[in-house]
Design a protein with these regions (language model features):
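Short coil-to-helix segment of the ABC ATPase nucleotide-binding domain corresponding to the Q-loop/switch region
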Residues: 89-98
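A short, proline-enriched helix->beta-strand linker immediately N-terminal to the Walker B motif
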Residues: 148-152
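Helix-to-loop junction immediately C-terminal to a conserved catalytic motif
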Residues: 49
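Catalytic Walker B motif of ABC-type/P-loop ATPase nucleotide-binding domains
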Residues: 154-156
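Conserved ABC transporter NBD signature motif
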Residues: 57-65
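Conserved ABC ATPase "signature" region
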Residues: 65, 100, 107-125
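Conserved ABC ATPase signature
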Residues: 129-133, 137
Protein backbone atom coordinates (compact mmCIF):
# COMPACT_ATOMS: atom_id res chain seq x y z
CA UNK A 1 0.00 0.00 0.00
CA UNK A 2 1.29 3.41 -0.82
CA UNK A 3 -0.24 6.74 0.04
CA UNK A 4 0.75 9.88 -1.83
CA UNK A 5 -0.32 13.46 -1.32
CA UNK A 6 0.28 15.67 -4.35
CA UNK A 7 0.20 19.43 -3.73
CA UNK A 8 -2.57 19.10 -1.16
CA UNK A 9 -4.07 22.26 0.32
CA UNK A 10 -6.83 22.67 2.88
CA UNK A 11 -8.42 26.07 3.46
CA UNK A 12 -11.33 26.60 5.85
CA UNK A 13 -13.00 30.00 6.24
CA UNK A 14 -10.09 31.65 4.42
CA UNK A 15 -7.61 30.15 6.92
CA UNK A 16 -4.88 27.92 5.47
CA UNK A 17 -4.57 24.64 7.37
CA UNK A 18 -2.42 22.73 4.86
CA UNK A 19 -0.40 24.48 2.15
CA UNK A 20 1.01 22.50 -0.80
CA UNK A 21 1.76 19.26 1.07
CA UNK A 22 3.67 16.69 -1.01
CA UNK A 23 4.25 13.42 0.86
CA UNK A 24 4.60 9.75 0.07
CA UNK A 25 4.27 6.80 2.45
CA UNK A 26 5.25 3.28 1.39
CA UNK A 27 3.65 0.00 2.40
CA UNK A 28 4.87 -1.35 5.72
CA UNK A 29 6.56 1.90 6.67
CA UNK A 30 6.23 3.59 10.04
CA UNK A 31 6.06 7.37 9.78
CA UNK A 32 5.74 10.08 12.40
CA UNK A 33 4.32 13.56 11.92
CA UNK A 34 6.01 16.00 14.25
CA UNK A 35 5.19 19.67 14.58
CA UNK A 36 4.30 22.46 16.91
CA UNK A 37 0.77 22.99 18.17
CA UNK A 38 -1.61 24.02 15.36
CA UNK A 39 0.94 23.04 12.70
CA UNK A 40 -1.69 20.99 10.84
CA UNK A 41 -0.82 17.43 11.93
CA UNK A 42 -4.41 16.43 12.72
CA UNK A 43 -5.71 18.23 9.62
CA UNK A 44 -3.24 16.28 7.50
CA UNK A 45 -4.24 12.97 9.09
CA UNK A 46 -7.93 13.75 8.55
CA UNK A 47 -7.18 14.36 4.86
CA UNK A 48 -5.24 11.09 4.59
CA UNK A 49 -8.09 9.18 6.26
CA UNK A 50 -10.73 10.73 4.02
CA UNK A 51 -12.55 12.51 6.84
CA UNK A 52 -11.96 15.86 5.13
CA UNK A 53 -11.60 16.79 1.47
CA UNK A 54 -8.65 18.90 0.32
CA UNK A 55 -9.34 22.31 -1.19
CA UNK A 56 -6.90 21.41 -3.95
CA UNK A 57 -4.40 18.70 -4.80
CA UNK A 58 -4.75 14.92 -5.00
CA UNK A 59 -4.56 11.98 -2.62
CA UNK A 60 -3.58 8.61 -4.09
CA UNK A 61 -3.85 5.15 -2.50
CA UNK A 62 -2.28 2.27 -4.42
CA UNK A 63 -1.85 4.78 -7.26
CA UNK A 64 -5.61 5.42 -7.52
CA UNK A 65 -6.99 8.90 -6.94
CA UNK A 66 -9.11 8.80 -3.76
CA UNK A 67 -9.41 12.56 -3.36
CA UNK A 68 -12.82 13.22 -1.86
CA UNK A 69 -13.68 9.53 -1.50
CA UNK A 70 -15.50 9.18 1.86
CA UNK A 71 -13.75 7.36 4.71
CA UNK A 72 -16.35 4.56 4.66
CA UNK A 73 -15.23 3.66 1.14
CA UNK A 74 -11.54 3.48 2.07
CA UNK A 75 -9.86 0.73 4.07
CA UNK A 76 -8.53 3.12 6.71
CA UNK A 77 -8.43 3.05 10.53
CA UNK A 78 -7.67 6.03 12.75
CA UNK A 79 -7.12 6.37 16.49
CA UNK A 80 -7.53 9.92 17.68
CA UNK A 81 -5.42 11.65 20.31
CA UNK A 82 -8.60 11.72 22.40
CA UNK A 83 -9.34 8.06 21.67
CA UNK A 84 -12.90 6.79 21.88
CA UNK A 85 -14.18 3.48 23.26
CA UNK A 86 -17.80 2.46 23.63
CA UNK A 87 -18.32 2.44 27.44
CA UNK A 88 -21.35 0.12 27.35
CA UNK A 89 -19.47 -2.56 25.38
CA UNK A 90 -16.84 -4.92 26.76
CA UNK A 91 -13.29 -4.65 25.48
CA UNK A 92 -13.99 -7.72 23.30
CA UNK A 93 -17.10 -6.07 21.83
CA UNK A 94 -15.21 -2.80 21.27
CA UNK A 95 -12.49 -4.56 19.31
CA UNK A 96 -14.99 -6.73 17.42
CA UNK A 97 -17.26 -3.84 16.38
CA UNK A 98 -15.65 -3.01 12.99
CA UNK A 99 -15.58 -6.71 12.08
CA UNK A 100 -19.25 -7.12 12.94
CA UNK A 101 -20.11 -4.05 10.86
CA UNK A 102 -18.21 -5.62 7.95
CA UNK A 103 -20.16 -8.89 8.26
CA UNK A 104 -17.18 -11.06 9.26
CA UNK A 105 -18.08 -14.59 10.44
CA UNK A 106 -18.34 -15.12 14.20
CA UNK A 107 -15.46 -17.64 14.38
CA UNK A 108 -13.18 -15.29 12.44
CA UNK A 109 -14.14 -12.38 14.73
CA UNK A 110 -13.28 -14.51 17.75
CA UNK A 111 -9.89 -15.45 16.30
CA UNK A 112 -8.94 -11.96 15.15
CA UNK A 113 -10.02 -10.24 18.39
CA UNK A 114 -8.01 -12.67 20.54
CA UNK A 115 -4.99 -12.41 18.22
CA UNK A 116 -5.04 -8.59 18.22
CA UNK A 117 -5.69 -8.35 21.97
CA UNK A 118 -2.76 -10.70 22.64
CA UNK A 119 -0.49 -8.59 20.43
CA UNK A 120 -1.36 -5.50 22.50
CA UNK A 121 -1.31 -7.42 25.80
CA UNK A 122 -4.94 -6.72 26.71
CA UNK A 123 -6.32 -10.24 26.28
CA UNK A 124 -6.97 -10.61 30.02
CA UNK A 125 -9.25 -7.54 29.89
CA UNK A 126 -11.59 -8.74 27.12
CA UNK A 127 -14.55 -9.26 29.48
CA UNK A 128 -14.13 -5.90 31.19
CA UNK A 129 -15.60 -2.54 30.25
CA UNK A 130 -13.34 0.32 29.14
CA UNK A 131 -14.03 2.47 32.21
CA UNK A 132 -12.66 -0.36 34.39
CA UNK A 133 -9.26 -0.03 32.68
CA UNK A 134 -6.34 2.33 33.07
CA UNK A 135 -5.87 5.08 30.49
CA UNK A 136 -3.13 3.11 28.75
CA UNK A 137 -5.27 -0.03 28.59
CA UNK A 138 -8.15 2.02 27.16
CA UNK A 139 -5.81 3.45 24.53
CA UNK A 140 -4.62 -0.05 23.60
CA UNK A 141 -8.28 -1.08 23.26
CA UNK A 142 -8.83 1.74 20.75
CA UNK A 143 -5.63 0.74 18.94
CA UNK A 144 -6.77 -2.90 18.80
CA UNK A 145 -10.08 -1.82 17.25
CA UNK A 146 -8.12 0.07 14.57
CA UNK A 147 -5.71 -2.81 13.90
CA UNK A 148 -8.17 -5.73 13.93
CA UNK A 149 -9.70 -4.91 10.56
CA UNK A 150 -6.37 -5.10 8.69
CA UNK A 151 -6.78 -1.65 7.17
CA UNK A 152 -4.54 -0.52 4.32
CA UNK A 153 -3.74 2.61 6.32
CA UNK A 154 -3.68 2.94 10.12
CA UNK A 155 -3.29 6.41 11.59
CA UNK A 156 -2.47 7.04 15.26
Amino acid sequence: MSLTLEHVCRVVDQQIYIDDACLSFEAGSFNVLVGRTLAGKTSLMRLMAGLDKPTSGRILMHGADVTGVPVRQRNVSMVYQQFINYPNLTVFENIASPLRQAGVAKAEIERKVHETAAMLRIEKFLKRYPLELSGGQQQRTAMARALVKDADLVLF
